[in-house]
UniProtKB/Swiss-Prot annotation:
GO terms for molecular function: endonuclease activity; magnesium ion binding; nucleic acid binding. It comes from Streptococcus pyogenes serotype M5 (strain Manfredo). Mg(2+) binds at T85, D87, E100, Q119. CDD domains: RecU-like (cd22354). GO terms for cellular component: cytoplasm. This is Holliday junction resolvase RecU. Belongs to the RecU family. Keywords: Cytoplasm, DNA damage, DNA recombination, DNA repair, Endonuclease, Hydrolase, Magnesium, Metal-binding, Nuclease.
Length: 202
């Protein structure tokens, strides 16, 4: 039997829908990692053909591999081939979407040491090409998540090249609080739809 493209799409969507049903977890209350919650959210969007957003693979160069068993290989030495840019990218309603996700246990600020110059430069390039670029910032102790537009992150970074932590008051003033949900867990596309597609940031 020949699998034509539309059949392959249906198979993929069906597979993702099953995965999504198996991952019915409220990460804010059940200890699910922030990254896992975002991945589950992206699976939800994909399964319903709302958006196609994927986590970028990290480019790694394998240097040494051991074979403790013939059927199993163990990587014992590797290094990053190049600096990574942002965590996620994809397409939503014809718009390129690119974002980074960060998490902290602090209650009053997000450490800027987690952001690097090459990431800031990458976000600047995405904005120059009219892409939708932002960061999702999760305060695990407060159980609060914010969508901060890349413009606001870049402006704060440029003050002192990212040497100071970003106060949560700055994030609340310049960003958008993401309401936790069950399906999807981190509905960041709601922010884009309401504020960037025909909204104040358009």
């Amino acid at each position: 039997m020949v699998n034509y493209p539309h059949n392959l799409i249906r198979q993929k969507v069906s597979s993702v829908q099953k995965q999504t049903k198996q991952n019915k977890v409220d990460f804010a209350n059940r200890g699910m990692s922030f990254e896992a919650a975002i991945n589950a959210t992206n699976d939800y969007y994909l399964s319903r053909q709302i958006a196609v957003i994927h986590k970028k693979p990290t480019p790694v160069q394998i240097v040494k591999v051991d074979y403790p068993k013939r059927s199993r290989a163990k990587i014992v030495e590797a290094y990053f081939r190049q600096a990574s840019t942002t965590d996620y990218c994809g397409v939503y309603k014809g718009h390129y979407v690119d974002f980074e996700a960060k998490e902290t246990r602090q209650k009053t600020a997000m450490p800027m040491k987690n952001f690097h110059l090459h990431q800031i430069e990458h976000m600047t390039c995405v904005l120059h090409q009219k892409g939708i670029c932002f960061v999702l910032l999760h305060f695990s102790t407060l159980k609060e998540t914010y969508y901060l537009p890349a413009q606001a992150l870049i402006s704060f970074y440029q003050i002192d090249n990212g040497s100071k932590s970003m106060p949560i008051d700055y994030i609340r003033k310049n960003g958008f609080k993401v309401a936790f949900g069950a399906f999807p867990q981190v509905p960041y596309l709601n922010i884009i739809e309401q504020n960037f597609l025909g909204g104040d940031y358009n």
